[in-house]
Amino acid sequence: MNRLVLFSLTATLLLSAKPASQAQTTGPWNNKSCAVVLTYDDAIDVDLDNVVPALDSVKLRGTFYLIGSSPVVARRLPEWRRAAQRGHELGNHALMHPCDGSLPGRGFVTPDNDLSKYTVTRAVSEVRANNTLLNAIDGKTARTFAYPCGDRQIGGVYFYEQLRNDFVAARGVTGGLQTAAQVDLTNINSYMINGQTGAQLIDLVKKAQQSGTVLVFLFHGVGGGHSLNVDLKAHRQLLRYLKAHEQDIWVAPMVDVAAKIRATQQR
């Protein structure tokens, strides 16, 4: 009788135990070990010329943060629509991309687009106007926001507080890897990329895999088009690594990953 009980208990434990590999992949990242989000800012030509074809070639989806007033949005609107139809997120990067000109090193900020001269009402209205434009392009209502220049305050007021219900989340510019529980959905961390090699980009992904965290890349130029740039080879190497390890890495637009984080935090 004792042997029978012992056998039954052992069998139960064996059936309920999870392999180590499975234990590492359970969690908030779509049952994978980590999440990687590829974001591209400012609505520049190389997004459509270089990035979208590269992502589509390996069947990965990214997030493109569009400045509504950018001539590239108006001139190539059908291409942006097609990108959205293929699963890429068109995120909101404000209508005019206002940055705080009162901060050090902000000589590039024009008086018309100086966030420090804005009222909160104006900032919120312009972001909502850009949402209307984006909805006209892609027909979607759920999307994320990215702070122009990472600036979050106007006169000490966090203007996004009035926009919480308009977006799933907002992406910031502070580098760092975080678990789902650690993420601040009003200011998601991201790594700004400028000149890194493919090996360095892949290294960041490996750290996310090891720590079970979310990694958000913030790109501007890819193969040119912006002073903040990564070369095509490095970007291609990153995409190839992500594709080769897609069983372990969840690569998705910011809106999808943020929605998953929100659901995890609300449990």
How should each PLM-predicted stretch be described?
Residues S190-G195:
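Extracellular glycoside hydrolase catalytic/binding regions
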Residues T25-P28, G62, P71-V72, N135, ...:
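C-terminal domain-boundary segment and adjacent tail
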